Amino acid sequence: MSPPRKLHIKSYGCQMNVYDAQRMVDALAPEGFVETANVDDADLVILNTCHIREKASEKVYSELGRLRVARDEAANHGRRMQIAVAGCVAQAEGEEIIRRAPVVDVVVGPQSYHNLPQLLAKAEQHGRALETEFPIEDKFGVLPQPAPDAIRARGISAFVTVQEGCDKFCTFCVVPYTRGAEMSRPVVAIVEDVKRLAENGVREVTLIGQNVNAYHGDGPDGRAWSLGRLVRRLAEIPGIVRLRYSTSHPNDVDDDLLAAHRDLPALMPFVHLPVQSGSDRILAAMNRKHTADDYRRVIDRFRSASETIAFSSDFIVGFPGETERDFSATLALVAQIGYAGAYSFKYSPRPGTPAADMVEMVPAAVMDERLEQLQQLIDQQQSAFNKAAIGRTVEVLFERAGRKPGQIVGRTAYLQPAHVMAPDSIIGKVLPVRVDSLERYSLLGELASATSRPADAMAATGA
């Protein structure tokens, strides 16, 4: 019996890439691959790339330069290391990667991960392999399911892709070009995935998609189901005590989703709802198809459905043509909404997007100054949100052992890390924690009660 081959995946960017990395591991497991954290030991290295962040392509080529050294070192010891580039940079620039980086054996787009074994074999025979077409077949129908041991090893929280692609075509974004048109998975397939996860110890599931609340998958009744209806069905699965979803578009928030937040204790009251700018002029230039007041009204509808709901968001500063007045409108929006956290970035052009051809570029120094201002405001809001937990009792789902002896780490409904000193038998349980203090972004406290209900019982009671 031949020894297992070692696989190292380095993922960049969004939660979808984290999920995709796991599915690539599942696809390669039948071929004898096992994961390793040490890139130098790997027989196959996959760079799972993201095209959203600044200088995404340059980072890929820089990493490939380092991998060339590791590959040469492996060859000196009589071992062949294959290198693959996956993800959105691979999709957008596949042929260029093949041309510029001879060290790469395989380039594969996000829609073709189920073909990885065949592509690796092709590269062995012919030197290199490239697949970045959008296939007709649904990759989710042919990707192998994770083994029970693999699910348990990944912990009590899991991502499940329910929707992929985007039809919005924001002028700054490459996602419609790298992930394709919106596609929703059938309800039955998602339910089967979540049941399998729950049966193997998963207690929290985050439903993910580039535009997740545009979900419209085929239901068992022959009709398209909304995200809200899907969440209701998943909340019925024994063992699942927490449900989340990300990332949403303001225009696709509907009554079904709001009602789910009103009715379902398992649906966490924390929503990531990107807005990008508080200026109507910039929102129009971004092709967001909503105004700042439209966004405010969506926030108000969420708050009417759930008094405990909180929000995070995404912001871009320095979009072409952004004036001080536009930026002030963004600050005003942030101040009015009040976020538990947010991500903010300086604009950087993505080749092939309409915004890349806009000529009114904001000077880099101005972008730096605006980003600092915005981040200061967001940090103040996040700090205030976290400090509000001191002295209160919050529900925490415990996930793993902490760094200190006897420490167990979990997360609140709002994804705040929470640390207590307790036995590891509490892992997988939702318990009340009395918060005593903060350490950076983490809550420190004590278990509020010696009695607890296991996650399975909480799911059954709807608590």
From Swiss-Prot:
MF (Gene Ontology): 4 iron, 4 sulfur cluster binding; metal ion binding; N6-isopentenyladenosine methylthiotransferase activity
Catalytic activity annotation: N(6)-dimethylallyladenosine(37) in tRNA + (sulfur carrier)-SH + AH2 + 2 S-adenosyl-L-methionine = 2-methylsulfanyl-N(6)-dimethylallyladenosine(37) in tRNA + (sulfur carrier)-H + 5'-deoxyadenosine + L-methionine + A + S-adenosyl-L-homocysteine + 2 H(+)
Keyword entries, A-Z: 4Fe-4S, Cytoplasm, Iron, Iron-sulfur, Metal-binding, S-adenosyl-L-methionine, Transferase, tRNA processing
SMART domains according to UniProt: Elp3 (SM00729)
Domain of life: Bacteria
InterPro entries, sorted: Elp3/MiaA/NifB-like_rSAM (IPR006638), Methylthiotransferase (IPR005839), Methylthiotransferase_CS (IPR020612), Methylthiotransferase_N (IPR013848), Methylthiotransferase_N_sf (IPR038135), MiaB_methiolase (IPR006463), rSAM (IPR007197), rSAM_horseshoe (IPR023404)
Keyword ATP-binding: no
Annotated positions binding [4Fe-4S] cluster 1: C14, C50, C88
Family of the protein in this entry: Belongs to the methylthiotransferase family. MiaB subfamily.
Protein name: tRNA-2-methylthio-N(6)-dimethylallyladenosine synthase
